[in-house]
């Protein structure tokens, strides 16, 4: 049985009636495929994995979708990971996955996705707040989230929710399949 997490107390004056009906609950193993599909629908333009494929093509015969799907499977398998679903009327409209490091007390928001038809309605905010609340209950002392430069939504949203930019990282790749390596 999925455990609902009440978030309505954060939305008492929500103008959007859908927001009053949103439920946040822990994902079950049976939710894996819908979470993967939400991810693939959302991450084409904002995924490091899709950047790799755009530049180098398939790697080991695997598409960016294959690699990103594996990341989501890892989120579900992680004993210190949690996946929270946002649902309305039993329809999954988004999710957030987190990883809890009990030694460092740092919780990481690994993936966040809202279905295209529900974006810009506050669902992402609710999911992040639910993730933060869960991290606090699990005695985390710091919440961390990362985004790519090309993710304009993340770059705008995360600071509004209290996250502070600390550093930028540049990803480089070299094609080792090329016989003409320098």
Locate the predicted segments by residue:
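Conserved acetyl-CoA-binding loop-helix of GNAT-fold acetyltransferases
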Residues: 114, 120-133, 156-160
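Conserved beta-strand-loop-alpha-helix junction that forms the acyl-donor binding cleft
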Residues: 119, 145-155, 172-177
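Conserved N-terminal entry element of GNAT/NAT acetyltransferase domains
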Residues: 1-33, 37, 41, 50, ...
């Amino acid at each position: 049985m999925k455990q609902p997490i009440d978030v309505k107390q954060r939305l008492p004056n929500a103008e959007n009636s859908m927001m009053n009906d949103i439920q946040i609950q822990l994902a079950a193993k049976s939710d894996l495929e819908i979470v993967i599909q939400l991810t693939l629908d959302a991450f084409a333009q904002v995924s490091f994995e899709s950047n790799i494929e755009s530049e180098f093509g398939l790697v080991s015969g695997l598409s960016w979708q294959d690699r990103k799907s594996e990341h989501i499977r890892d989120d579900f398998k992680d004993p210190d990971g949690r996946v929270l679903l946002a649902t309305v009327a039993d329809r999954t409209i988004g999710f957030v996955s987190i990883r809890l490091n009990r030694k460092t007390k740092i919780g990481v928001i690994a993936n966040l996705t809202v279905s295209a038809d529900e974006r810009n309605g506050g669902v992402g905010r609710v999911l992040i707040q639910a993730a933060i609340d869960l991290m606090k209950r699990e005695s985390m002392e710091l919440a961390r989230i990362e985004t790519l430069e090309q993710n304009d939504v993340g770059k705008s949203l995360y600071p509004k929710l209290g996250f502070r930019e600390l550093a930028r990282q540049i990803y480089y790749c070299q094609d080792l399949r090329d016989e003409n390596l320098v």
